Amino acid sequence: MEKDVASLSSDTPIVVFSHIPLFAMYPDWGWGTDDATQALSYLKRFASVTCLNGHVHQVFSKTEGNVTFHSGTTTAYPLPHPGDGPAPKPLTLPAGKLHDALGIREVSYQTGQHTLALKERTLL
């Protein structure tokens, strides 16, 4: 990461994708990255940094200084919230409820005469 950002201007928006969160979300369950402090130190000089991760199967957002973190929900199976139980074991849901708990969405569009625009929305 240090080499990747070394030549960039500090006003360059940075987006980092990682599987495990770059902050200590819940270390007892392995929901954090051991070298996160070092990785984030390379990004301190940038005005806008967004870190996106999975692993925790939870929608979660927080901001620390110039860095905004977003954890995405699951596309496989739901996990309990941090600390609910001794370990992050898959939750059992009633029949027919699994699809509602997953981060699977269908997106459709109709071809028109204008370029398709993407609209950013805040994660809830």
Task: List PLM regions with ranges.
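Binuclear metal-dependent phosphoesterase catalytic core
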Residues: F60-L124
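His/acidic metal-ligating clusters that form di-metal
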Residues: M1-T68
